[in-house]
């Protein structure tokens, strides 16, 4: 599937010189301020629908743009990636929790970390990780069997998928058994990320050292995460993998002191925290929404139960409708042209996969859950749940494989049914999560 500009649309080939992008006036922004704060997904979608593929907001510093076309997203993330920085308020605020890890780092720090982490995400390592997923799923089966020993049970799928994803992340990437810490770690993660969102949406955030209620909560959550991260590192230092071990997890790669540029203890902490916070939260979000969509589309749930190989299609379509990373931001280092429009240096550029994935030029009936869209693979343009370009998520292949494995296994053994037919509201936090959790009825599928 490919994307082409519709007749009469403005493309880079239609301009002799780039022009200024259109956008809403101050009055419209003031009227929609509450929506910006409380329903940013709808705000971004309607802004694109009202004003077009490249929109300039009436904000003087920094000049801010929304880019919503598939080609525009490619211009930002691929074609002009060297002219883009991650030094935005969103990533800077997140780095208060994770440090300058792979997700938030810029330029040389990112290049060093990416190069060093690459061996941990080779295909052989990803295949070996399926054993850890199987172990975690076996433990989940045992827990659910106890819950349903006298019939069905009501569970919070959101919390369950968070715990499962964290357990798998600990075993796969760090060789650590986190089963006794999942409740504490997921709680600390959610509280830290809540603090990130509050700060990012505050036009005048107070320095973290100022004891506001939000800052105090953030600092406490960060201390708890630091304690857990340092314990993971210390356990490996006390019990390292044997020299020359053919099986190397991410932590072993991070701590390799034989490299030309070995990472410092601080940088190792940053990367471990990044994958604990961002890594497990992302796959947990996708799995939660997959069960919501399957519960809302019982015919697709039945097809998955009969044909478990469809799990990859279900996972990919879930990532289209509910991309965990629903907004990607960049700051321009120099003026660039995007879809024929001029974006100046030092501007904030927003690319929202939530909006791009609802473009009818790429996705007919975009609001419908249709896993078969991916029967022939994803389109080259218009699908970016893991970003695009050099900053494409390093864990993409692992996340897709693990997501499909989890969906396939659970759908063969368990039925998750909605307890009501109402649409679940979306909490657009650092990732997309259901407001108030996702209660569903758990029933064992009889052999």
Where are these regions (language model features)?
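Cytochrome P450 fold signature focused on the C-terminal beta-domain
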Residues: 240-247, 301-309, 321-340, 350, ...
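Conserved cytochrome P450 K-helix E-x-x-R motif and the immediately C-terminal K′/meander segment
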Residues: 32-52, 308-341, 360
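N-terminal membrane-proximal hinge/A-helix region immediately C-terminal to the signal-anchor transmembrane segment
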Residues: 2-108, 112, 134-139, 179-180, ...
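Conserved cytochrome P450 K-helix/beta-meander segment immediately N-terminal to the heme-binding cysteine loop
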Residues: 351-377
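Cytochrome P450 heme-thiolate monooxygenase catalytic core
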Residues: 2-21, 85-91, 109, 125-285
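Cytochrome P450 proximal C-terminal region
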Residues: 2-9, 17, 48, 137, ...
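Cytochrome P450 catalytic-core helices
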Residues: 282-305, 397-412
């Amino acid at each position: 599937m490919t994307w082409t500009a519709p007749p009469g649309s403005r493309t880079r080939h239609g301009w002799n010189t780039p022009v200024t992008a259109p956008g809403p006036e101050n009055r419209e922004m003031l009227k929609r301020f509450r929506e910006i704060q409380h329903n940013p997904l709808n705000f971004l979608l309607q802004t694109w629908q009202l004003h077009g593929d490249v929109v300039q907001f009436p904000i003087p510093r920094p000049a801010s743009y929304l880019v919503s076309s598939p080609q525009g997203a490619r211009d930002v993330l691929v074609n002009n990636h060297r002219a883009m920085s991650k030094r935005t308020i969103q990533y800077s605020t997140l780095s208060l929790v994770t440090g300058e890890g792979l997700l938030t780092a810029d330029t040389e720090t990112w290049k060093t970390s990416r190069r060093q982490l690459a061996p941990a995400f080779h295909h052989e390592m990803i295949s070996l990780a399926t054993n850890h997923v199987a172990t975690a799923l076996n433990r989940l089966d045992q827990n659910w069997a106890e819950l349903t020993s006298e019939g069905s049970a009501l569970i919070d799928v959101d919390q369950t998928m968070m715990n499962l994803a964290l357990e798998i992340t600990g075993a796969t990437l760090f060789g650590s058994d986190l089963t006794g810490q999942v409740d504490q770690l997921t709680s600390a993660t959610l509280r830290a990320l809540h603090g990130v969102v509050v700060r990012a949406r505050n036009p005048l955030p107070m320095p973290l050292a100022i004891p506001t209620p939000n800052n105090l909560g953030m600092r406490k959550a960060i201390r708890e995460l630091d304690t857990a991260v340092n314990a993971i590192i210390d356990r490996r230092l006390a019990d390292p993998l044997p020299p020359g071990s053919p099986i190397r997890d991410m932590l072993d790669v991070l701590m390799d002191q034989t490299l030309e540029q070995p990472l410092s203890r601080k940088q190792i902490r940053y990367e471990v925290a990044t994958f604990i916070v961002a890594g497990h939260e992302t796959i947990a979000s996708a799995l939660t929404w997959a069960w919501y969509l399957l519960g809302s589309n019982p015919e697709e749930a039945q097809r998955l139960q009969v044909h478990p190989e469809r799990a990859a299609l279900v996972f990919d379509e879930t990532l289209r409708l509910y991309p965990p990373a629903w907004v990607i931001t960049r700051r321009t280092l120099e003026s660039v042209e995007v879809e024929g429009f001029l974006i100046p240096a030092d501007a904030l550029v927003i690319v929202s996969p939530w909006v791009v994935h609802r473009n009818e030029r790429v996705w007919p009936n975009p609001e419908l859950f249709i896993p078969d869209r991916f029967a022939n693979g994803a389109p080259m343009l218009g699908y970016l749940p893991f970003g695009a370009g050099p900053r494409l998520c390093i864990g993409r292949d692992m996340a897709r494989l693990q997501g499909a494995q989890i969906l396939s296994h659970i759908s063969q053994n368990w039925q998750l049914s909605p307890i009501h037919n109402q649409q679940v509201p979306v909490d657009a936090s650092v990732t997309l999560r259901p407001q108030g959790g996702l209660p569903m009825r758990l029933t064992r599928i009889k052999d």
